[in-house]
């Protein structure tokens, strides 16, 4: 029963992540003026990271009593990724973006690297969730 709940929780998280990355964020930047879109996304990301961390942590806690250590490790890694993104990566991305918008070319390059790292982390988390779902589906 706990593994099933963890499966559903993880599947919902993966679906939300894919929707956010492939649907919501691109839509914001194609439908809103650039400055408005940037401010809006900056306000949304802390919520996205908190919800992601909380959901992955819930999956981790649901799995703990099962002793399925590989699944527990994957769920915990996803939660950790969200916390890393929220408390380390996001402030650095925002600071680099702000300096870049003020004309600092080096900051623009730093922003591009940090943003790329953020996208890569999100992709790695999605792959970890796919792996977790496969493990849980196997029973």
Write out the residue ranges for each language-model feature.
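Polytopic transmembrane helical bundles with strong interfacial aromatic enrichment
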Residues: 1-139
């Amino acid at each position: 029963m706990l593994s099933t709940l963890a499966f559903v929780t993880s599947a919902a998280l993966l679906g939300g992540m894919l929707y956010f990355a492939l649907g919501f964020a691109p839509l914001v930047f194609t439908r809103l003026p650039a400055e408005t879109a940037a401010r809006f996304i900056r306000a949304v990301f802390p919520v996205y990271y908190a919800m992601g961390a909380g959901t992955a942590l819930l999956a981790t806690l649901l799995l703990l009593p099962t002793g399925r250590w590989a699944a527990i490790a994957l769920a915990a890694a996803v939660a950790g990724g969200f916390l890393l993104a929220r408390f380390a990566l996001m402030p650095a991305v925002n600071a680099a973006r702000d300096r870049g918008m003020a004309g600092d070319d080096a900051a623009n390059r730093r922003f591009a690297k940090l943003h790329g790292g953020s996208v890569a982390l999100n992709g790695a988390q999605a792959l970890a969730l796919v792996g977790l779902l496969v493990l849980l589906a196997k029973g």
